[in-house]
Amino acid sequence: GKDNLLDLCIEKFGKVALFHRLDRDTSGLCLLTRPGEINAYLDKLFKQRRVVKEYLALVSSQKEIDAEGVIKTRLRPHPRRRDQMVVVGKGGFYAESRYEVLGESEGKKLIRIWPITGRSHQLRVQMSYLGVPIIGDRIYGGGEKTGLRLMLHAHKIELPAADGFETRSFSAPLGEDFKQLIPTSLINLLP
């Protein structure tokens, strides 16, 4: 059987293009298209960094961080672990994200994150770098003993109007397993 979304879509629809993919353990919205004019439009928007991607993350409150901010780092693959990225002072690939802490309770913070760039593992590495690893992240320090999946969710994508296409916004609801981990006092803060 097929074990990933791309294979399932190809089987059902034929040729598709993948414009917004997720790390294996991240839940939420993917953006796939069938061949056509939309692909040139999306390609242009992504290259110009005009697509607004919004994620929700539940992180460990190990450290105090600003209520909102911008994280700018340089990332490169780990020299020995190919499945891992590391922050470096020089070289690597520029990675930038904006974040907002929606609330904090019971040792957890609910954070909304907007990646500006789209590097592999970017949000996971950057949250860990800030000292607030994403819960369930076995690679970057938030899930060694929890047994939980990664609490990172691609919540929303906004595509601006351009080249004859209208503004579009897509969202994916949080899964029940994610919602159950959010402290009751923070549930009403969800966007």
Walk through the language-model features, giving the residues of each:
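RNA pseudouridine synthases
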Residues: 1-96, 103-106, 151, 165, ...
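Thr-Gly-centered strand-to-loop micro-motif
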Residues: 89, 111, 135-137
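Pseudouridine synthases involved in rRNA/tRNA modification
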Residues: 120, 124-191
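Short histidine-centered loop motifs in beta-beta connectors
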Residues: 106, 111-114
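A generic structural motif
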Residues: 102, 114, 160-162
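A structural micro-motif recognizing beta-strand termini
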Residues: 60-62, 113-116
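Loop/turn elements at beta-strand to alpha-helix junctions within RNA-recognition modules
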Residues: 36, 116-117
